[in-house]
């Protein structure tokens, strides 16, 4: 959701009250809060910028020189949600399953809404007549999310989408811990950047819990060096020990 104040009511403290009440309600039940917003505005409420992602640049020349004529013809595309009640429910269940197979995911109560918010297009990926994945597209050529049943289809499917739609390029964003996707994209794409995920801001209530969760995920996906580290974070003493990471 969003927090908005009418222009005529600015300066009256409404946002401060709303955010303050929200944080008070959640502090006892959450370890971490996340939102998108302007840095200084949310710094007042204890939020700090964070996150990382890779954005790969795939252009038509990369595709032309990597795949010969006909090699991408097995892939076809259609709207993931055909605006048919039963079919939409089945598509949402398919996308939900793929999402929840990722090493780190957010539980989505309404998959269709999540994949169509902020002007996104949800596109189903088909291979030889079988649905194998989906992609979420913004602005015509920005892939903000893409999932497939078999990782070997990830890059060819994106290349096929570029070719089928006569696009000059695609910008493909992935989390840094999805190392298999990153390796496959880096073999084909023209370039990449490493950057923050939009305007992501975070407030941590329980540092030990958040650090344990994040380091566990990193150890499982990217690997981590052994060692011990101690600090006092906003009054919370924390010691981290990694062994056989």
Residue ranges and their predicted role:
Residues 1-13, 24-25, 33:
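Basic, Lys/Arg-rich alpha-helical nucleic-acid-recognition elements, primarily the DNA-binding modules
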Residues 34, 122-124, 230:
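Residue-level detector of beta-strand face positions
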Residues 40, 47-66, 152, 156, ...:
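Active-site/acyl-donor-binding loops of N-acyltransferases
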Residues 9-21, 153-161:
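Conserved acetyl-CoA pyrophosphate-binding loop and the N-cap/start of the following alpha-helix
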Residues 49-163, 209-223:
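Amide-forming acyltransferase catalytic core, primarily the GNAT-like/NAT-type
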Residues 20-24, 43, 96:
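A broadly conserved amphipathic alpha-helix scaffold signal in soluble, globular proteins
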Residues 19-37, 166-177:
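Conserved GNAT acetyl-CoA-binding A-motif
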């Amino acid at each position: 959701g969003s927090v908005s104040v009418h222009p005529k009511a600015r300066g009256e403290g409404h946002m401060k009250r709303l955010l303050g009440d929200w944080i008070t309600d959640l502090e006892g039940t959450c370890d971490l809060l996340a939102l998108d917003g302007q840095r200084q505005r949310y710094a007042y409420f204890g939020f700090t910028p964070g996150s990382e992602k890779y954005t790969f640049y795939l252009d038509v020349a990369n595709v032309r020189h990597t795949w010969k004529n006909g090699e991408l013809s097995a892939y076809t595309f259609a709207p993931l949600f055909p605006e048919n009640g039963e079919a939409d429910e089945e598509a949402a269940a398919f996308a939900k399953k793929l999402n929840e197979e990722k090493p780190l995911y957010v539980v989505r109560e309404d998959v269709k809404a999540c994949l169509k918010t902020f002007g996104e297009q949800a596109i189903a990926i088909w291979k030889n007549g079988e649905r194998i994945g989906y992609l979420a597209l913004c602005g015509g050529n920005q892939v903000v999310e893409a999932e497939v049943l078999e990782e070997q289809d990830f890059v060819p499917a994106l290349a096929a989408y570029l070719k089928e739609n006569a696009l000059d390029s695609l910008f493909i964003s992935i989390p840094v811990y999805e190392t298999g996707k990153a390796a496959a994209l880096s073999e084909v794409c023209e370039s990449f950047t490493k950057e923050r995920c939009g305007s992501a801001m975070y407030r941590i209530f329980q540092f030990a819990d958040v650090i344990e969760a994040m380091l566990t995920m990193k150890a499982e996906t990217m690997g981590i060096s052994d060692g011990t580290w101690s600090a006092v974070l906003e009054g919370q003493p924390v010691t981290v020990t990694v062994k056989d990471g």
